[in-house]
C-alpha cells in the first residue's frame, strides 16, 4: 500500500508568484504548491522544517528558495523542474563582517565588508523575505528581529558576499525593523532594494573591491515622502524605483539620490492639440507652465492618492507600460508607467488608466490585497492574492471601450483553523468547515471547489451522514446546530467544470441547542439519529428523516459532572444497522430494553472515560414525542474508565461495539476491546480498562484517527504535522516506511499541525485537515507497490539476461532452456477464480439482504396518503369605525416619532424659543437637579463599594502580614531561622482614598529622595549642615565614653546577656535545664564518663537525655508546622495582591475598550464623510470630462471655426478661477494637492482625483546634470514667453520654476549608472526588463557599465536641451492669454453659436471652480483623519498590552498554584506511617481548590509514584533473576558432582553378562510390544468413533427435516391468523358503525341546544357593545382632541412636543448636561 499526495487545498494569504508562463506558486501549510492554471495540475513541494515563512522564485533559471520557520531557520534552494534540493544555507551561522579599513566605514553609512570576519555570529531567529538575482547566482536573505540583517549569498558556493543590519529610521536613531520585501535590480545583481515599516526602505549597493566588497545602504532622502507616510512596498521599473506608502501614495524614486524623480513638461502646441482632439479635448496638466503654453519647470513623480480611500499600498507590480497599485481596502488601480528613455515616453506617464475589480459588485471589497505580480506568457496577466484565502487573475491591459477590468477567481480556500473533514455520503468529495464560518465541498480527484455555504459564526464541529443520505451537520461556537442538504458530487463537479454557479448547500435544520461551542456531532449508522455534544455539558439527540427532509430534537441528557466530550463514534454491527430492533414497541422511553438490539454511540470523555449511549427502538422509529417539558431524555448510559484519555476515537464494525481505536493523550495509538457484559462497565471510578495493544504514534498529542470503509486500514494525524497509515494490527505499512513519506510534515507545525483525518466513501482517498487552514488529499493504491516490485523483478531479469549474453558461448543458455513454471501459473489462475467467486457470492448476499430490509421497512412505515388534511379557521375583522380610530391613533404616533427622529433627541418637556410659565420652568429645574443628584448618588455608591472592597483587602493583607511576623517570632524563639524564600518584603495596598488633599500631598509635591539631579546648596545652608554634623559627632563621642546601656549591663547582668540558670531559656518551651551537677562539671552530656559519676547521677542523666530527645522531636514538629503556616500566609497574601492588581487591570481594560469604541465610531463617521467628499469630487471630474468629450458634438456646425473655438475653450487666465464661486484662496492653494494644475492650454482631471502628469523622465544622475537641464529649460521658457508677448497679447505669467536637482546633503554611493533595458527588445514585449540578445550590450551583467559615466551624462544633457528647446518653439504660437472674449470672436461665426460657446465655456469654468472647492474640502477632511487613526491604534495597542498583562498575571497565578512544595522528613532506614489526626476546625487559612485541580495533581503524583514502584519492581525482578541464576549454577554444580560420582561407581562396578546385555540393547523389548498393542487399540477406537459420529449426523439431518416441516406449518398458521385478523377487524368495524349511529342523534341534539344558547349570548353582548360605543363616542366628543388626516401632515408646521417631563434620555442620545444647557 502506497500513499501519494493527490492535491493541496489551501492558501496562507501571503506571497503568490509566477513560476512559468502558466504556472504559479503559493504557500499551503508546510508546502509550496506549484499550480498550472490551464490544466489545474499541481505539484507539491514539502518543507523540511516546522513551517514555511517565505519563498522566492527565479523564473528565468527555474529556481525556488524556501525559508523554514524556527529559531535557527534554514534556507533551501530547489529546482522547479525536478523539485530536487540544490543547496542549503544557514543564515544563523553567518558572522558579522568588518569593513577592513577606515575608508570603508563612514559614519552612518553602514558599510560592511563581505570577505573578512571580525565579529561573532549573527542572531537570525527568522527569515522575513527572500529574493533571487536575475542571473540566478545571488540570493538575498532578510532576517527578523533582533538583528534585522540583510545577507547576500553566492548560494552555489554557500559564500556570503555581503551582510549588514537594516539602517535605523530617521525618527529613531537606534531601533531598526525587519524588511518585509526585498528584490534585486533586474539588470544589475549588485543593486537591491528593501522596504517595510519603520524606515526599512533603502537601496543597497554591493561594490566589489580588490580584497573585499563594500555593502552599504542608501536611505530615503529627507522630505522624500509626505509627512506621516512610510514605505510599505516597492517594485523596480525602467524609470526608477516605485514605492507605495502607508497613506495610499505612489512615488517614483531616483536610485542615485533616493529622492522623488523629477518629471519635466512634455511638448505642447500642435502636438497637444492633436492629443487633445484624439481624447475629446482633455489633456494632462503640466505643473509650472504658464497659461500661454510655454513649457515650464519640473515636478516630482508623486501620485499622492493612488489609493483613493487613503489606505496603505500593499503591493506593486508592473510591466513595460502599466503599473498596478493594490491597496489595503481591496482596490487595484492601474497607472501609466514612466518609460526608460525620452524616445519611449507615453502621452500621460503616471496617469490613471483603469481599475481592476476583484468582485462584480464594485472596485473594492474591504479585504486587503496581500500580494500582486504581473506575469504570464505575454507578461500582461495580473495575479492577486488576498488574506481571506482567495486568489484572482486579471488582465493588466485596459478593456476595450473603457471601464473597469474584472478578475477571475483562481483559488478560494479556508482561512484559519479547520474544524474537521468528512467524506461526502455520495462519494467523490470531502466536506470541510472551520473558524471562517464556511462549509465547503472539495473534489477528491483534483481538489476543485464544488460547493460553498457561508455561515454567520465560526464552526467547531462537522459530521456527515452514512452513505444513502446526502446530509451533513455543522456546529458553531455559539451552540447552533445546522443540518445541510448536500448536492451530488457529480453535479457539482460538472457545474465547476463549466464555470456555472456552484450548487447551493440548503439548510434543512437550524436551532441553538447549546449555550457553549459544539464539540462533537455524529450520525447513527441508519441516518435516523443525530447526536450533538457541547461544552455546556449537554448532549442532544435529534431525529432525522432523510426521506421527508425533517429534523426534530428528541431531548437532551447531561454528561458526567466536569466532563467534556473529545470524540464520538457510532459503530455499526456486522449483521446490519439494526433495523429490525423493536420498532413496534409503544409507551415512554424505557431503560430496560434488551441490550444488544440497538446500536450504541461511544463518547470519549476528557477525564479518561468512555461513555456508551444506547437509544431505544422507539427513538429510532421517528414517531416518538418527548412527554417531558424540560426535554429530558431517558436512555441507557454505561461508563467505562480507560487508562488514558482518548483524544480521537474510531470504531471497526463488530458484533456488539466492535474494536475501538483511539489516539491517546500519551501520544500513542490504542486498540480497545470493549467488554460485552454490562457488569464490566463499572463507571469512571472503577479499575481502568487496559488497552489490548498500544504503539507510539506521533510526537504531539492532539490530532485525529480514521478507519477505512473496508475496515482494513487505520490513518492517524497529529499536531506534529504527520499522517501515518497502519493496518489493524497497528503496524506501519512498509510501503510508507520506505517511500517518500507523502503524508509526513505537509502541515504547519507552528500553527497546530493536523486536526483530523478522514477517508472518502470508497476508501481510495485520504484527506488531512490542519490548524493552518490547509487540506491535503492523498491517494491510496496497491498499484504503486506492485509496480515497484514488478520493476525490481524486471531489473533483476534484465541483469540475468545481460549476464547470460556476456557469458561464454558454450556456457550460454538458449531460449528453449529457460523453463516456465506452468504449475504455478495454473495455481494462480485457480486462486483468482476462487476469489472472484467468493466476492460475487458476498455481493449477491449483500444485495439480497438490502432488498429484504427495504421490503420490511416499506411494509412498516409506508403510507399511501402523501398529503395530510388540515383545519383552517380565521379571525373576524373588526367593524369599520374601529379601523378608522386605529388609523388616526397610528398616524398621530407616526408624526410624533418623525418629529423626534428629525430633532435627534427626546426632550424633557421644554422646547427652545417657546414661552412657558414659571411653574413649568421651576419644575424643569427640579427635574434636572433630581437627575444630577441621582447621578451623584450612583457614583458615590459605586465609589463606596470600591473603597470598601479595597479597605477589606488592605485589612486582610495587614492581618496576614501580622500573622507572618508572629510566625517568624515563634520560629526565632525556637532557634530556627525561616527559609530564605520566605524572608521577602511585606505586601501592602494603600487603603488611603485619593482625596484632593492626598493628591496634593503625594502627586503634586516632590520629595527630596525623588530628585535625581544634584541639589544646589547655598553657603549659609552648607555651614548650617556642617555645624549639625559636628554636633552629632561630639554627642557620639560623649556617648561612647559613658554609655548608659553598657553601664547597666555590667551592673545588672554581669556584662553578658546569657540566660541564667545554666543556659535555660524561659521563653523557649522546648529548652530543658541541665542538672546542677552536670552544669558544675562543665562538659557536654554526651561526653560524661559513666565511670566517674554515681549510679543516681547516671540514671538522672539518662532521664534528662530522654526528655531532651522528646523535646527536640516536638520542637522539630513545631518548626515544620510554623513553616507551613508561613508558606500558607504568604500564598494567601500573594493571591490577594494579584487579585487586586487584576481587578485594576480589568477596570483599565474596560475604560480602554469604551474609549476605543468611541474613537472607532468617530473615525467611521469621519471616513464616511470623507468617502462622500471623494465621490462628489469624482462626480465633478466626470462632469468635466463629459463636457470636454461633448465639445465637438455641441459645436459641430462651426465647421472651419472649430479649431479656433477649441483653442479658446482651452485657454485659461489665473484670475478666472479666483473670481468663480468657491475658487478663491482654497482653490488656488490646493490646486496641486487635489490634482488640478495649470497647463499650457487646458485643465484636466483624472478619475479619482489622481493627477495626470504630462511630463518626461529625467535621466540625470548628478546634481550638476539636473541643474544644467533645469537651467536650459528655464531659458527656453523665457524665450518662448518673449515671443508670445511680441505677438500682440500680454503675457500671463512667468515661465515657471526651473528644475531643481537632488538635495545637497545626499551623496551618491554607486560608482556607475544603472543599466537600461535594450531598446530593440523592449519594443517587442511587455516585460519591463526583457532578456537582451547575445552581444547586444553588457547592461544585463551585474556590475558592468557600457559607457563611461562622463559620456553617459553628456548624452543625457544633450537630450534634455533639445527637448526643452523644441517644446518652447512649439508653444511660442499659443502664448497669447485671453482677457476679453468679446474681441476674440472669429470672423464669420454665427452670433447665436458664439453666445452658446460663451455660456458653455462659463459652465466649464464653473465646473472647474467647483472641483477646486471640492478638493479644498477634501484636504480639510483628510487633515484630522491620521490623528484619529493614530489615536484608535494607540487605544488598540493599550488594550493589547492590558490583555497581555492580565494573561501573564493569570498564567503566573496558575504556575504558582501548581508550584507547591511538600516537605517529608523520614528517619534513616525506615518509613514511619503516622496515625491520622483529627482535622482542625479553623478554616481561615484554607484555600478552595477545584476538584479537577486536585484530581489532576493526584494523577501526576500517582503517575510518578507508579513509575517509582515500577523501578523498584524492576530492580527486585532483576535481583530475583540474579539469585535464580546463582541457584541454577549451584544446582548444576551439584548435578555434575552426582554424575561424576555415578560414573565413578559404574567404573568400579563388577561387569556381568546381564549388564552387558542391558548396555547393548538400551531398554527392555517388552516396551515395544506394549506400544504395538496400544496402537492397535487406538485404531479400533477411531473406527468406532467414526461410526458413532455418522449415526449422530444422520439423526441431525432428520431433526433438520422435522424443523423445516414445522416451519412450513407455522407459516401456514401465520397466514391463517392474518386472515382471521382481517375478519375480526371487519366485525369490529360493523359493530362500531352500528353503535355510532345511535350516538350521533344524541350528539346532534346537544349541539343544536348549545348553538342556540351561544347565539343568545352573542346577541346580548353585541347590544351591550353598541351601548358602550355610544357612550364612548359621547365622551370622545367632549374630551378627545381632533384627529388629523394623513394627507395634511406634510404641510403642517412642527407641533410642540407633548412628552411628559419625566421621560428619560434613550441610550446613545446627547448627555443630560447638554440638554440642561439648552434649557
Swiss-Prot record:
One Pfam match, given by its short name, reads WD40
What start-end ranges are recorded for coiled-coil regions in this protein? 1524-1609, 1651-1679
Compositional bias (Low complexity)? 1257-1269, 1344-1358
Q: Biased composition, Polar residues: where in the chain?
A: 1709-1719
Predominant place of localization? other
Question: Can you say where the WD repeats lie in this chain?
Answer: 122-165, 174-214, 226-263, 308-345, 413-452, 513-552, 697-736, 749-788, 1073-1114
| Localization per record | Cell projection, Cilium, Flagellum; Cytoplasm, Cytoskeleton, Flagellum axoneme
Source taxon at top rank: Eukaryota
Gly residues bias spans = 1221-1233
Q: Where does the record place the region Disordered?
A: 94-120, 569-596, 1022-1045, 1220-1269, 1277-1296, 1325-1372, 1685-1719
Identify the GO cellular component terms for this protein.
axoneme; motile cilium
Q: Which family does it belong to?
A: Belongs to the CFAP43 family.
**UniProt-recorded name of the protein:** Cilia- and flagella-associated protein 43
Gene name of the record = CFAP43
